[in-house]
Amino acid sequence: MRLVLLGPPGSGKGTQAARLKDTFQIPHISTGDLLRAEVAAGSPLGVKAKEVMARGDLVSDEILLGMLEARLGQADVANGFILDGYPRNVAQANALDSLLSKIGQPLDAVVQLDVASELLVERIAGRAKAEGREDDNPESVRKRLQVYTDSTAPVIGFYEQRGKLARVDGVGSLDEVLKRIGQALGR
């Protein structure tokens, strides 16, 4: 199973990706985690990424795709993967499709977790208190939701046109949402 998990901040992508990893016995690949690991390892891509981030700039699609290509070449992804945090825009979706086609591992499905904006803000506010996440302050949350709406939401249409999209209600208990994802994937 080769899967992309989409959804706005606070929709439960990371939580459900971790649960799907255990359910399907395939790795959960987070581009944020990849970036941090490459920087920590001091790899050539990590050095480039660190320089970019030190300037306060966003890491380029080229660097992210290079990291993804290296990760997808590892043995543990032979039976599939769950990709979380990428693609974030249509250009990245096209690049990902090209990469996966090149390595002979096209996506099986893209799951979009749907959660109302008001509930997202509540969830994120609760997470900020519980985890002390600096990027979960109200102003940052509004900005992240707007960025998602402007940049990432068009990715939904991209995959819908290709017949890969499954929309799942992301509201409910962790088990309820996991069950809905399984049903959407025909499992």
From Swiss-Prot:
Gene designation: adk
> Known CDD domains for this protein?
ADK (cd01428)
Sequence similarity: Belongs to the adenylate kinase family.
Q: Where is this region: NMP?
A: 30-59
| Domains as described in the record | Consists of three domains, a large central CORE domain and two small peripheral domains, NMPbind and LID, which undergo movements during catalysis. The LID domain closes over the site of phosphoryl transfer upon ATP binding. Assembling and dissambling the active center during each catalytic cycle provides an effective means to prevent ATP hydrolysis.
Q: Where is this region: LID?
A: 126-136
Keyword check for Ribonucleoprotein, yes or no.
no
The protein's enzyme class: transferase
Q: Subunit composition? A: Monomer.
Main localization, broad class: cytoplasm
- GO MF, one example: adenylate kinase activity
Q: What does this protein do?
A: Catalyzes the reversible transfer of the terminal phosphate group between ATP and AMP. Plays an important role in cellular energy homeostasis and in adenine nucleotide metabolism.
Q: Which GO terms describe its biological process?
A: AMP salvage
Give the EC number: 2.7.4.3
Q: Which InterPro entries does the record cross-reference, listed alphabetically?
A: Adenyl_kin_sub, Adenylat/UMP-CMP_kin, Adenylat_kinase_CS, P-loop_NTPase
Q: Where in the cell is it found?
A: Cytoplasm
Give the lineage. Answer: Bacteria, Pseudomonadati, Pseudomonadota, Gammaproteobacteria, Lysobacterales
Pathway involvement of the protein, from the record: Purine metabolism; AMP biosynthesis via salvage pathway; AMP from ADP: step 1/1
Q: Which organism is it from?
A: Xanthomonas campestris pv. campestris (strain B100)
What is the top-level taxon of the source organism? Bacteria
Q: What is this protein called?
A: Adenylate kinase
> Keyword set for this entry?
ATP-binding, Cytoplasm, Kinase, Nucleotide biosynthesis, Nucleotide-binding, Transferase
